[in-house]
């Protein structure tokens, strides 16, 4: 079969494109997904779960060999040791990130998209993208000019009656601290706290593949979904991309197509381009890859949202009670830091009442702090070798802009006094600065040993107060207290630099931009510059990461580009 469209990656963007492009019967559409299928009626229980921790920590659903650095790399001191490599969970399953993520369904600030257009992505301002945000969703709670009512992805908020005791205490505390209550996170964009919007219906995740690749859509004879299919090479005739080579369940295959669309995410899409000789010329020559098209921006200016947490021990009455809801995040807040020219609503706090799948995780609640409008954009993706089977080298360089570090320290110092509120005092104790360290990741690995060990530790934590204090200080805490962060600038900076991690919102490595922008990889329709028949459609085309969890912006972008393609054809 000669395909009209070959989509490399069946994630959030790929699922949308597969549905929309195959809706026209004359289009033959192939989706190549390296991971497993999530067929209707047979979606793994870990994926369906409202609590996502058993999905995103499961090696079955991720690129398990992917490691990245997050700390800033010194370019002044060539002898400085490289920061430690950390695991970075990226989905390897139909539905992509939407199959394993925290199900957070938000859009960002209108100013984010006006900035996209200002940076050269013509036609991507807020007014132009809002119709596609509405098109993708059915909001189950609100029906007004901000919301969609017949899209494939349901959006809702967990009702207050189903919140954990911890969430209720935070609600009271935010109110007493004079933060404004907003019933709708996705309504008019302003500072305040709100029930977080989630892509979930009747206590089950609804991923992009579940929403867009339904049983009815899968019956289309012109749509071909090939899972367990690793694309190993892009095929070219001169500067036209004409197909892909792939391993389908281990067997070599070749597929030809009129247009190839990379939807492999902000780490793997640029890697596909560079292996094909499209990217920074010097880097390609170093690896002996013949240069097909020099594009300096491929893999450059990688972004994510820097994050740290303040955790605390939860009394039994405050924990997630799995009967009504397994959701661990009920409330969020955005506020304006007013630091370093940051726009309004630049900071985001999400309140979690469970921090891992195991028994100790159930005893720990946290404020997760995101720099939602980050200024750090010096990360990069490079190849380690020309081989398709070797993961790329990924350096996020989080906090490369000092303003991001200052805003995280400021956030910790704003939140710490809230633990003195009577509502928080009644349900939490032992607040401490926390990080998603390798130690935490190891204990979070899903296996019998961790289940047994955390079961024992949890019983001890629920024991006498002196024992709990000892265990938290010696096993859960870093080597710094909340008091020290609040009172010592040097200690605060050292902790945040070491502890800050990204929140799986990798973006911007194949940015859209104007014709005269030497760092623009794609035009405003995702078409790769100087190469015919090749597009990128995923979070890597964002000109800058929006002030949002990136799943809905990615789905929106795929909806918008799919509409453009169908209009053109």
Where are these regions (language model features)?
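N-terminal redox-cofactor-binding region of secreted/periplasmic oxidoreductases
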Residues: 1-569
């Amino acid at each position: 079969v000669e395909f009209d469209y070959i989509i490399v990656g069946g994630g959030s963007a790929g699922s949308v494109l597969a549905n929309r492009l195959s809706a026209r019967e004359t289009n033959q559409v192939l989706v190549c997904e390296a991971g497993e299928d999530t067929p209707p009626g047979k979606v793994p229980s870990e994926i369906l779960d409202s609590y996502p921790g058993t999905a995103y920590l499961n090696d079955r659903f991720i690129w398990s060999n992917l490691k990245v650095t997050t700390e800033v790399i010194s370019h002044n001191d060539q002898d400085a040791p490289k920061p430690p490599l950390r695991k970075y969970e990226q989905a390897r399953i139909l539905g992509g990130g939407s199959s394993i993520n925290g199900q957070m369904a938000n859009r960002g600030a209108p100013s984010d998209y006006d900035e996209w257009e200002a940076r050269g992505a013509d036609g991507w301002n807020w007014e132009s993208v809002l119709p596609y945000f509405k098109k993708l969703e059915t909001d189950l709670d609100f029906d007004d000019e901000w919301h969609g009512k017949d899209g494939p992805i349901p959006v809702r908020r967990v009702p207050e009656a189903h919140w954990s005791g911890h969430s209720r205490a935070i609600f009271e505390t935010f109110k007493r601290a004079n933060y404004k209550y907003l019933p709708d996170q996705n309504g008019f964009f302003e500072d305040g706290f709100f029930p977080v919007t989630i892509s979930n219906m009747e206590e089950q995740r609804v991923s992009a593949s579940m929403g867009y690749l339904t049983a009815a859509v899968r019956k289309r004879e012109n749509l071909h979904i090939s899972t367990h299919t690793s694309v190993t090479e892009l095929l070219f005739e001169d500067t036209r991309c004409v197909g892909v080579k792939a391993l389908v369940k281990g067997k070599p295959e070749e597929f030809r197509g009129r247009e190839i669309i990379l939807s492999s995410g902000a780490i793997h899409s640029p890697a596909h381009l560079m292996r094909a000789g499209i990217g920074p010329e010097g880097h390609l020559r170093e690896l002996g890859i013949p240069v097909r098209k020099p594009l300096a921006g491929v893999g450059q200016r990688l972004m994510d949202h820097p994050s740290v947490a303040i955790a605390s021990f939860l009394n039994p009455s405050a924990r997630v009670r799995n009967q009504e809801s397994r959701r661990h995040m009920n409330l969020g807040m955005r506020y304006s830091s007013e630091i370093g020219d940051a726009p309004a609503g630049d900071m985001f706090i999400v309140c979690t009442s469970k921090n891992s799948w195991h028994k100790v995780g159930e005893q720990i609640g946290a404020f997760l702090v995101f720099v939602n409008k980050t200024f750090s954009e010096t990360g990069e993706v490079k190849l380690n070798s020309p081989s398709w089977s070797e993961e790329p080298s990924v350096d996020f360089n989080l906090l490369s802009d000092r303003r991001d570090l200052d805003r995280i320290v400021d956030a910790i110092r704003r939140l710490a006094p809230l633990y003195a509120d009577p509502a928080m005092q009644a349900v939490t104790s032992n607040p401490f600065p926390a990080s998603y360290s390798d130690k935490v990741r190891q204990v979070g690995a899903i296996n019998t040993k961790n289940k047994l060990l955390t079961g024992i530790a949890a019983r001890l934590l629920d024991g006498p107060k002196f024992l709990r204090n000892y265990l938290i200080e010696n096993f859960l805490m870093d080597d710094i207290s909340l008091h020290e962060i609040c009172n010592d600038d040097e200690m605060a900076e050292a902790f945040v630099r070491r502890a800050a991690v990204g929140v799986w919102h990798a973006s911007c490595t194949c940015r859209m931009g104007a014709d005269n922008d030497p760092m623009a990889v794609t035009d405003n329709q995702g078409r790769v510059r100087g190469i015919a028949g090749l597009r990128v459609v995923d979070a890597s085309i964002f000109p800058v990461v929006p002030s949002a969890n990136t799943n809905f912006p990615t789905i929106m972008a795929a909806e918008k580009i799919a509409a453009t393609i169908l209009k053109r054809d």
